[in-house]
C-alpha cells in the first residue's frame, strides 16, 4: 500500500490560479519507505480555499476510487481524505499498488475517522459508503458509519439544480459553476483501465528499478482523487444556500407599494451564485443577487376575506348576513334566520388589504394577529396589512418576522 501525505495551506487563489503539480512529487521515494508496514510515503504541499461552515476539527472529507460499481466484483484501489489536524489541513491518500491491499486501505481510513463528527462527500450516500460497507462485510471487519454524520453535498446541489440552471449534478459541473479549476482530464470510469495497466507494469518496473511508465499512470490516478476531494472543500460553499433559505439573513428595510411590499436583506456570507437569480411564486418574488443582497416582493391583495373563530359551538351562523355571531347576541335573532355554526361557517368577513402569511415565529405580537382565509380548508392564510404597519417598531416590521 502506498501512502501519499500532503499539508494544505489556506490560499484562496488556489482554485482560480492553480499551479501545475510537479511530477516528481508523486514518484515514490525509497528513502521514505516505512519498513514495518511496507508502506511508501510521498510528501508534498498544496493549497486550497477553506469554505466549510462547521467546526473544521470535526470534519473529514473523503472519496474513493474503484474498478467497478459492484463491491463484490471490483477492487477498492484508492481512498483519499482531507481533515484538520495540528493547526493545518492534512490530505492523505491510501493507494493499493497490489490488489490485496483493500483491508489495509479500510483500516487506515477508519483510523482517521476516530473522534470525527462529520463525513463530507459527493454522492457518498449513493455509492462510496454503501461500497465500503460491502467491503467491510466481505472481509468480516468490525467497522461502522453509525457514529459519524454523513453530509452529502450531491443532495444539496441536486436541490438547487434548477435554480442554478445546471445541466446535471456531476461534481465537475458544480465545480465549473463555482469557477473551480480542475487539471484532471479523466473520469473515474476511464481510470479503471489506467489502474489495471498500472498493476500490470508496476511490479515489473519495480524489479528493474525503472518506474517511469507506472509513475505517469500513478500521477493520473492520484490527481483525479485529489481534486475530487480538495475541490470539494470549495464546493461546501453551496451549503450557504441552505442558510439563505432558512432565513439566515440580515434585514435592511422595507417599502410598501400599491400592489406589493418590498423587503430588503443582505447576507454576511458570500452567496455561491455567479448571476442574479429570480424565483417567482404565487404570492411573492425572491431576487437573490451576486452582491449578497436579497429582495423579497410580497403581493398585496385587496379583497374580502374571512376570519374563522375556533370555538364555533358558541356561535350561530346568520343565513342572510353570511356571518357568525356569538350566541349571547344571536339568541335575539329569529330562529329561522340562524343555525348552529360549523367550523366552516363560523366566520366574519372583512374587506381590506392583506399580505400572505409565511412561516413565522409566534411571539406575543404575531399571536394576537388574526389570520384570514378565502375558504375554511385553504392552507394559505393572510394578515391585514394595516395591522402589520401599526405594529412596526424601530423600523423592523413584523412583516419581516413573518417571512
Across the structure, where does each feature detected by a protein language model lie?
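DEDD superfamily 3′-5′ metal-dependent exonuclease/proofreading module
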Residues: 1-62, 67-74, 84-403
